[in-house]
């Protein structure tokens, strides 16, 4: 294994350990020492890979983008097929509802309010998600030969807001034990718009 491969594997290990710490303690309660200990590396080694906690948080934004990439690729490949766009929405909702993802979403939102660099990195992911969904929604309308009730960008924003707000409620612990209060897949289908 080459040195570059080992460095990349170590960075992945550090990032996974940091994510576990962030989910358990939050960004501000997690120290670089906590991350080094969780990753099983020395503090010096950690600083060789990441100059500080903000760099790790920015790497989380890159990891989020990479995790979303396959979903977005499938959405692009849907070519306006309503059922496939609905599958994307359900898959994205399932991803956002994962406990770790939901808890991290709360942390990201709070950190984004305080740190413009973090806000910019995660906003880029959101813009990509919204733009890709808007394009798919436009194709759905064209395929079904209908005029959308909302502009595709606004419709995409409403759909993503519904999904992400459900995840934030979970991350805040407001939705524990209330599966009935969860975002209904039927609502996503309704927000997707009527067929022609």
Where are these regions (language model features)?
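Hydrophobic/aromatic-rich alpha-helical bundle segments in the mid-to-C-terminal region
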Residues: 119-123, 127, 141-191
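Short alpha-helical functional segments enriched in proximate histidine and acidic residues
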Residues: 21, 67, 95, 132, ...
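Amphipathic alpha-helical segments used for helix-helix packing
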Residues: 84, 96-120
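N-terminal intrinsically disordered/low-complexity leader segments
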Residues: 1-9, 20, 141, 196
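Amphipathic, non-transmembrane alpha-helical scaffold segments
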Residues: 57, 61, 65, 119-130
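Short alpha-helical elements of helix-turn-helix
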Residues: 11-12, 16, 103-106
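Hydrophobic alpha-helical connector segments
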Residues: 59-62, 72-102, 152-159
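Helix-turn-helix
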Residues: 13, 17-55, 59
């Amino acid at each position: 294994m080459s040195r570059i491969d080992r460095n990349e594997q170590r960075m992945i290990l550090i990032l996974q350990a940091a994510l576990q710490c962030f989910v358990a303690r939050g960004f501000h309660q997690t120290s670089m020492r906590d991350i080094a200990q969780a990753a099983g590396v020395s503090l010096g080694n950690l600083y060789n890979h990441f100059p500080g906690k903000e760099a790790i948080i920015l790497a989380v934004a890159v990891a989020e983008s990479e995790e979303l990439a396959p979903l977005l690729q499938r959405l692009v490949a849907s070519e306006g097929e309503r059922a496939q766009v609905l599958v994307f929405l359900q898959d994205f909702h399932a991803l956002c509802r994962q406990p770790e993802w939901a808890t991290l979403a709360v942390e990201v939102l709070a950190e984004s309010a305080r740190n413009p660099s973090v806000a910019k990195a995660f906003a880029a992911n959101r813009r990509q998600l919204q733009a890709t969904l808007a394009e798919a929604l436009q194709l759905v309308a064209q395929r079904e030969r209908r005029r959308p009730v909302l502009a595709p960008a606004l419709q995409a924003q409403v759909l993503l807001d519904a999904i992400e707000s459900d995840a934030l409620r979970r991350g805040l612990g407001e939705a524990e034990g209330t599966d009935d209060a969860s975002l209904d897949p039927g609502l996503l289908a309704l927000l997707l718009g009527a067929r022609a």
